[in-house]
Design a protein with these regions (language model features):
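Solvent-exposed, polar/charged alpha-helical surfaces in well-ordered, non-transmembrane soluble domains
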Residues: 280-286, 458-466, 470-474, 496, ...
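Active-site histidine-acidic residue metal-binding/catalytic motifs
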Residues: 418-505, 515-518, 522-524
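Short beta-alpha junctions and helix-cap segments that line functional grooves
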Residues: 244, 491-495, 559-561
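Soluble non-cytosolic domains of exported or imported proteins
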Residues: 45, 131-132, 272, 276, ...
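Solvent-exposed loop/turn segments at secondary-structure junctions
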Residues: 423, 443-445, 485-489, 511-516, ...
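Active-site-adjacent mobile loop/cap segments within catalytic or ligand-binding domains
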Residues: 501, 505, 512-516, 527-530, ...
């Protein structure tokens, strides 16, 4: 369900909520000492943490006996260092006192001292893995210095050698605080070694006889099970042996299993966990050979990984491949569909450029002699090339810089690429013919960030979104709202609303906070986030426009893999209007007059951006 607005609708709750926020700010002097983040017993791996809270503006607030800085309204957000283990912080305001306990956990495994033992959870592979014959498999363990470490796998014994010190990379969120440089790690005493597996193994594929049809077909191919590795450690004359948790098998190259994508858009990644980057989603029905496994993750023959939960195995299927001969066009209202007739639904990828869209088909060989290329509203020319024996690349050269969204799907074995046309102005108002989706972030139990007085991000997001909606409607736009009340809505549901409603642009409205090691006292400003190339110009333009017109500090423009920036069906941008965590900026965020200025400026920026894109 979503909410569609194309005429002015009075919002009763907006005025009341603004009064509540005003009342909160006005009555700050009557409030007691409060710390809203972190809660006591918080655990973090950060080397420092900020504290968000407030107290009456008269008087002073101390943390562990040290006076801290506060805003004119009495809010504070100091950052303090953390030691490994338990850290206690005592907050004092006049005769009031709060104790907050924060535990810092280490990033590296704890090394046993002076005893023959492996560090807990340090043996790798930690999950069951499967590899092709002749591939390299590496083993590692953390053990005390001067240990003699080896691993036995089947009839092989592999020595594990101590490794030189390597730097640690911080979490991806460190890019949001500017503290993303490598961290010098203390010596972890990691022992590693590698070997090849299955080079001299032979595979037999058993046959299955169907008693009804009397036909004989290949059954499930036999895997070579090498079992779990045995790790051995010798120190000071004492030897221990520990069995690893991950079993190792070798896949049969004569009949690799074939997986079919069962989700609408299979999440392809660069490696076997959600820590790895996303690639172009695989359309439902895509078929691809499995060349490796890591736990629940499948390595696919074109190089990507996918969680097995998004696939099903097709028994007895041979490795999918196809030839391609022709390409067809279907011109529809507001969009063009390009049809690629294939023999099998193969993996694909898409890369957008400034005036191009490049589609790659894997496991595909061209037998193309001719295809039709009439004039098209958005495409100036289609080029193609066989970039390697199993990979065909199609380059759509476009007439204008701005792209308005695309979708991929399979109809049977034919791939359909849908490319959307630019909006057509159908009235006198500046945004006539434009549909804008507004997504007020969070909602329901998902409250988002919190201000020092307990103001919740979800509420402010909704207030601002309603104001933007009303301004957009006055300019002639049709507006879709993912929510218009305090309800919980999953990220997947929000994405589906974008894909189903096909807005001209989609904006997700948020207010910011920081990772634990951020400088909440000083970091503030307006920021925008984009993922697909088609959204970059909109993100950059709105950022620059709002920062200049409102004289707000710039937090920056970020490429970011966020659920509400990923939809490719429309240019999708996430806006962070300010920092709930900043003790000064929060006063602007909750001020009704500043809320109206922000909403109107964002709307003005949208109008100016459409004026600009229509010219080029």
């Amino acid at each position: 369900m979503f909410y569609l607005f194309n005429g002015v609708k009075p919002v009763l709750g907006l005025f009341l909520f603004s009064l509540i926020l005003t009342s909160q700010a006005a009555n700050a002097t009557e409030q007691s000492l409060k710390v809203v983040y972190p809660r006591t017993n918080h655990k973090t791996s950060a080397d420092r943490i900020f504290f968000i809270g407030t107290a009456p503006s008269t008087g002073q607030v101390f943390i562990n006996g040290k006076l801290i800085q506060r805003s004119s309204a009495g809010h504070f957000a100091p950052s303090l260092p953390l030691q490994i283990g338990e850290n206690n912080f005592t907050f004092r305001y006049q005769n009031q006192e709060l104790l907050i306990k924060v535990t810092r956990v280490g990033l590296q495994p704890e090394i046993p001292q002076g005893v023959a033992a492996f560090a807990p959870n340090s043996l790798t592979p930690a999950v069951d893995i499967a590899r092709l014959p002749g591939e390299t498999v590496c083993f590692s363990a953390v053990a005390p210095p001067s240990s003699n470490v080896s691993v036995k796998l089947g009839n092989q014994t592999v020595s594990l050698s101590p490794q030189p010190q390597t730097a640690l990379l911080p979490d991806n969120k460190a890019a949001l605080t500017g503290r993303n440089q490598p961290i010098t790690a203390s010596s972890s005493h990691t022992y590693s070694g590698c070997t090849t597996v299955g080079s001299n193994l032979s595979f037999k594929t058993p046959l299955y006889r169907n008693n009804i049809s009397n036909t004989v077909t290949p059954d499930t191919p036999t895997l070579i099970d090498l079992g779990k590795p045995e790790f051995q450690l010798t120190l000071n004359g004492k030897t221990i042996t520990t069995t690893g948790t991950g079993k190792i098998t070798v896949l049969p190259t004569n009949q690799l299993q074939v997986a079919e994508v069962t989700s609408d858009a299979g999440v392809a990644r660069t490696g076997p966990s959600t820590d790895f980057s996303r690639l172009t989603p695989l359309p439902k029905g895509t078929r691809v050979s499995i060349t490796g496994r890591d736990g629940d993750w499948l390595r696919l023959d074109y190089g990507a990984w996918i969680n097995g939960k998004e696939t099903r195995i097709i028994p007895g299927a041979v490795a999918p491949s196809t030839i391609i001969r022709s390409v067809g066009y279907r011109n529809l209202p507001g969009k063009t569909e390009i049809v690629f007739p294939l023999q099998a639904p193969v993996p694909v990828s898409v890369v957008q450029g400034d005036k191009s869209l490049v589609l790659t088909l894997y496991n595909t060989t061209a037998q193309t002699d001719t295809f039709r290329t009439d004039d098209n509203p958005i495409i100036s020319r289609l080029d193609w090339q066989q970039v390697n024996p199993n990979q065909v690349q199609y380059t759509f050269n476009l007439k204008k810089n701005q792209q308005w969204g695309y979708k991929l799907r399979y109809e049977g074995t034919s791939l359909i690429l849908t490319m959307r046309h630019p909006p057509i102005k159908n009235g006198r108002k500046p945004l006539s013919g434009v549909k804008v989706l507004l997504d007020p972030g969070h909602g329901g139990a998902e409250s988002g960030a919190s201000g020092p007085e307990g103001t919740l991000e979800k509420d402010v997001n909704l207030v601002i979104s309603r104001l933007i909606r009303d301004d957009l409607i006055k300019r002639g736009a049709t507006v879709v709202m993912t929510r218009d009340s305090d309800v919980e809505l999953s990220l997947v549901d929000r994405q589906k609303i974008i894909d189903n409603s096909e807005p001209t642009i989609a904006l997700s409205i948020h207010h910011n906070s920081l990772p634990d090691n951020g400088d909440a006292e000083n970091i503030k400003g307006f920021g925008t986030f984009w993922y697909n190339t088609q959204a970059h110009d909109l993100a950059l333009f709105l950022h620059n426009y709002v920062v200049k017109k409102l004289n707000r500090p710039s937090y920056g423009v970020f490429w970011n893999n966020l659920a509400l920036t990923r939809p490719a069906s429309s240019p999708s941008v996430l806006l962070e209007l300010g920092f709930m965590s900043n003790p000064n900026e929060i006063q602007l965020i909750v001020d009704p007059s500043d809320q109206k200025k922000m909403a109107q400026t964002i709307t003005d920026g949208i109008v100016e951006w459409f004026n600009k894109t229509r010219k080029y």
